[in-house]
């Protein structure tokens, strides 16, 4: 096998603001990974996020370390052992590992002539609808974003400032009776969160994501018994090893393949969460269709989906599995089923 990569820039349609940043702090620069074997090529995307200490530079450094491990393998089919060897060689840059894992799965599927969902024995028709994310912005821009999301029955609203009630009121007025979900990106403290969540419930919000800092276990324990809404954690749950410790602290987890290390670990997280009685959401970074596709193949296993990353980009250079409106579609193309646009 031969491993190569390229660095590209794909900015969002709008500056993507959340509570801990101003402007689009990550995701514009990404790395596309190619793994070739016997004339067949698998693709993957690394979307590094500075919140996790990653950048295109750290991804490339990790890929340099991974290259020899992958190229020493006889073929891509021994996924478990290859990924185990990669993790031993590189215990950082999960987005780089996710890109390599995705490219390997794509390669195996193409060589077998099967889409990933068939390799995993899944039923794509069971996938939930995806939400569409509304980032923090000024009132007139918020109204325009809600109009742009007309085809989406579920909106995910970013909060975490002193304007939370104003933002939610504007979006509820524009969205009518659509389902609203809220992501605070760890902006609140426990007592504040309890009050904010009561306000969210008054606006008919379905659940709240990551209300507290990732390591505030006492705060999550406090909220778990008092919150008016279910609590889903994102930043508090990086990979499957975090999940058992979240029982009694949260009602569910948000899996992102760029955060956990790829589709193989994502699948492990889903099964671990189910065994712990937790709900499962699958999300994404601001990824192109290439980055979204493996999550789309897994989506039939989850309760909630937020796979709108490619829809938030100014341009998407790929076509394939992802969203058709709010519906998650994967098709029968081999591997990821992704092609250049």
Where are these regions (language model features)?
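Mobile, glycine-enriched helix-loop/loop "lid" segments at the mouths of ligand-binding/catalytic clefts
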Residues: 308-312
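N-terminal capping/lid subdomain adjacent to the active-site entrance of alpha/beta enzymes
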Residues: 1-180, 185-194, 198-202, 226, ...
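Short helix/strand-capping turn motifs
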Residues: 303-306
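Catalytic core of soluble alpha/beta enzymes
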Residues: 157, 162-284, 288-299, 314-326
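Alpha-helix C-terminal capping segments
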Residues: 108-111, 297-301
């Amino acid at each position: 096998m031969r491993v190569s990569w390229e660095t590209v820039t794909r900015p969002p349609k709008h500056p993507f603001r959340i509570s801990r940043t101003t402007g689009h702090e990550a995701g514009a620069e990404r790395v596309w990974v190619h793994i070739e074997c016997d004339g067949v090529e698998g693709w993957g995307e690394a979307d590094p996020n500075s919140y996790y200490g990653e950048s295109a530079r750290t991804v490339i450094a990790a890929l340099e370390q991974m290259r020899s491990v992958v190229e020493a393998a006889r073929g891509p089919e021994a996924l478990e052992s290859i990924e185990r060897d990669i993790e031993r060689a590189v215990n950082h840059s999960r987005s780089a590992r996710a890109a390599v894992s995705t490219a390997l799965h794509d390669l195996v599927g193409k060589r077998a002539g099967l889409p990933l969902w068939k390799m995993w024995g899944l039923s794509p028709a069971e996938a939930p609808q995806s939400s569409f994310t509304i980032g923090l912005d000024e009132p007139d821009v918020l109204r325009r974003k809600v109009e742009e999301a007309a085809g989406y029955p579920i909106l995910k609203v970013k909060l975490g400032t002193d304007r939370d009630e104003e933002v939610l009121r504007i979006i509820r007025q524009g969205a009518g009776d659509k389902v609203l979900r809220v992501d605070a990106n760890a902006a609140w403290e426990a007592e504040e969160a309890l009050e904010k969540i009561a306000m969210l419930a008054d606006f008919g919000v379905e659940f709240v994501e990551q209300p507290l800092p990732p390591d505030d276990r006492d705060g999550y324990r406090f909220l778990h018994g008092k919150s008016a809404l279910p609590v889903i954690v994102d930043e508090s749950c990086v990979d499957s090893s975090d999940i058992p410790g979240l029982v009694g602290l949260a009602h569910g987890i948000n899996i992102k393949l760029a955060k956990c290390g790829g589709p193989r670990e994502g699948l492990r997280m889903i099964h671990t969460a189910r065994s712990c009685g937790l709900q499962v959401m699958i999300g994404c970074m601001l990824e192109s269709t290439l980055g979204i596709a493996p999550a789309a193949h897994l989506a039939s296993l989850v309760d909630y989906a937020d796979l709108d990353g490619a829809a938030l980009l100014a341009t998407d250079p790929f076509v394939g599995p992802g969203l058709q409106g709010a519906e998650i579609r994967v098709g029968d193309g081999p591997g990821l089923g992704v092609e250049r646009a």
